[in-house]
Amino acid sequence: TLSLDYSEVLMAAAGTQAEAARAATMAKYPNGYIAVVEGSIPLADGGVYCTVGGRAFAEIVKEVCAGALGVIAVGSCAFDGGIPAARGGITGAVGVSGFIKDKKVINLSGCPMNPENLTATIVQYLTLKEFPATDELGRPLFAYGDSVHQRCESLPHFRKKEFVKEWGDAGHRAGWCLYQMGCKGPSTVANCSTIKFNGGTSWPVASGHGCVGCTTPRFWDTMVPFYVEGDPKVIEYLNKGLRSEL
């Protein structure tokens, strides 16, 4: 049985009623609930940059995760701090696994995270009583095992060296490869191209926009500029067999 007992976004309660619901859930199911954390955790200046009910978010996260049987970090901010942790940030933001050290954290990176991956992670636990196998960054292999490039619908165009040269050109309209327009699919692991978004409706490349590498650590710093062709060394790296054939 799955029961969503506390969610700031979805629950009708607010303020003290919402916080009371969280406390009641923790008391009713000690070491028997899954904590799903969204958003980065600011640590600078005593955690003042994010407070809930007058308490630092960091304090609440530590309290909730301490009594959880499992912790899932959803989205890039919860994964590694996201935009608040990018260069120039002052909040001291970190991801959940950078803050909670005494429990295994399942990281579902992405901006946005795909809800299908969250559902699959929880269903596997409910069914098998164990969380999915993960990579070295705590990301489930079923979702982050292959590069976006490997499963991309534009891969045949890449292999034929059919690249979009500018937005709106004939190649763009024909669905050619967006690598030269900045697509970071070769160096990004995610299952966006196979499960897509909005119930399988579409995903960025199918909409004519390249991958920005949002599942990658510190992507706001490491994947910019987004609209400049990827470093040729990435392709060289992949061609050496460190990933499967392009």
Task: Set out the residue ranges of the language-model regions.
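Iron-sulfur-associated redox domains of electron-transfer enzymes in respiratory
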Residues: 1-193, 202-204, 220-225
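Short amphipathic alpha-helical patches
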Residues: 87-88, 234-238
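Short cysteine/histidine-rich metal-coordination sites, predominantly Zn2+-binding motifs
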Residues: 197-204, 225-235
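Residues that flank catalytic or metal-binding motifs in active/ligand-binding sites
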Residues: 207
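The −1 position to Zn-ligating cysteines in a subset of zinc-ribbon hairpins
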Residues: 210
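Short, cysteine/histidine-rich loop/knuckle motifs that typically chelate Zn2+
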Residues: 213
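Short Cys/His-rich local motifs and their 1-3 flanking residues in nucleic-acid-associated proteins
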Residues: 216
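Short Fe-S-cluster ligation motifs
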Residues: 240-246
